Amino acid sequence: MSEQTPRDDGEIFTLVDEAGNEELYKEAMRFQSPETGKWYICLYPLDEENDEEVGIQAFAFEEPTSEEDELELLPIENDAEWEMVQEVLNTFIDDDGNFNA
């Protein structure tokens, strides 16, 4: 069953860049595409949480099969997926640029 209403579990993720630096990110939202059934998650840097603008990172992922499994973030594979994620994200940004999930 597709979940069309995004949800925010408020999870904190540690992302590691190419130089090996760790940065904490907070979940903005996750949703499942009704067309493909794939799951997506949008994250922002935790240290930008109270800033007027934050940089959003988006990833695909597969739902873990058990609570012990960690969520594995996957790169978004093509332009069509990026456009779909951007469209969903834009539906939750108001005219003032505030995110309202």
Swiss-Prot record:
Pfam families: DUF1292 (PF06949)
Highest taxon of source: Bacteria
Matches recorded under InterPro entries: UPF0473
Family classification: Belongs to the UPF0473 family.
Name of the protein in its database record: UPF0473 protein LAF_0524
Taxonomy of the source species: Bacteria, Bacillati, Bacillota, Bacilli, Lactobacillales
